[in-house]
Amino acid sequence: MLTLVAKCLSKLGISLVYSYLCTIKENDMQKHTSIQLFRYEPTEGVAEYHAMLRITNPKLTYAEQVESLLAAYDQLLRTELAGTVAVFKRWFLSDAANQANYLLATQVEQSDCALSIIEQPPLDGTKIALWVYLQKGVQTRTLSHGDYEVSHGGYRHIWSASNFNQASKSEYQTRLLLNDYIMRLAEQNCTLANNCIRTWFFVQNVDVNYGGVVKARNEVFLTQNLTEHTHFIASTGIAGRHASHEVLVQMDAYAVAGLQQEQIHYLYAPTHLNPTYEYGVSFERGTYIDYGDRRQVFISGTASINNRGEIMYPGDIRKQTLRMWENVETLLAEAECTFDHVGHLIVYLRDISDYAVVQEMFEERFPTIPKVYLQAPVCRPGWLIEMECMAVKAIHNDNYKPY
């Protein structure tokens, strides 16, 4: 039925965007995996896909869960998503110290894109989950420092994943991470201020180490002319662990070369949120980029906050979830988007006992959007929940090259 609808819309010149549950059951391992898939398929140009793969049987061993996900992903590429390439993967693990090396060994033959591996335990009781961002109609290559380039339409999209070092403090690690990234961008004739669109900072023991991340980021950003008078970068700063206990901060990032500065817009939602610099941090609430044929939206990690920077509904997970949705919805609306344009949701919870309530709420409101629920305390202890997302919407703008 979906294929028939797609063909009919294609004849009318309408881009197809939809999300649905795709369960592949080819062998005994694949039957333990569920796949939620979002498709953005314009009649011309690059198609975009978000896939969220999760295990349905938590009793499987870790090796069996990995095998099941890999088999289902391979089958997905050979069937539903034939002809696509992955541009970014993030693996969510329950115990990175005991799991990451095994997973990396399986990826040697599948190192086809930027690869992020982080300990953020799936809250459904399984050991591993996978988010994949895929595209069709692009050229890809690995850059000298391991970053991953996706090119098409006169743009170069640079994905960087699993960056870390082992300096003695979170502040020093963050400063080294950012300075190294700035140098890598310079090799691609890019800058942090003009080209970096999105960052993720995963912080071990976030209640203790996040302050060092904030201090270093503020100081480095100042040297790059990223201030309250210019702009910052959309970001998530959340709990997450590397396999090594000595790694206090891990960073992923996304940059685009070839943009005009007029294509980049920042989201504020001042009726609901305040500028982050007012409480001492430096990131944008969200960013959208206009191309000739589409608008891409990147919503930062967003919690239950008001426009005075205060935590809304302390201790009440239901009300915090509702306020968080309202905040994200307002940011999306500023980009002339709705949740119908969202490709995936990542939901972070501090307290695992809130999972049943939150999962029920999300499944009722967003049954088909690809999503994953993770144990990952937010940067401020009073925030019980946080979420992030990406969205895409068809537009037409003759001032810019198509995506």
Regions found by a protein language model. Name each.
Residues 3, 11, 17-25:
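Short, positively charged and aromatic/hydrophobic N-terminal segments
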Residues 12-13, 379:
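Intrinsically disordered, low-complexity, charge-rich segments with an acidic bias
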Residues 20, 25-343, 348-403:
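N-terminal presequence-like segments and the immediate start of the first folded domain
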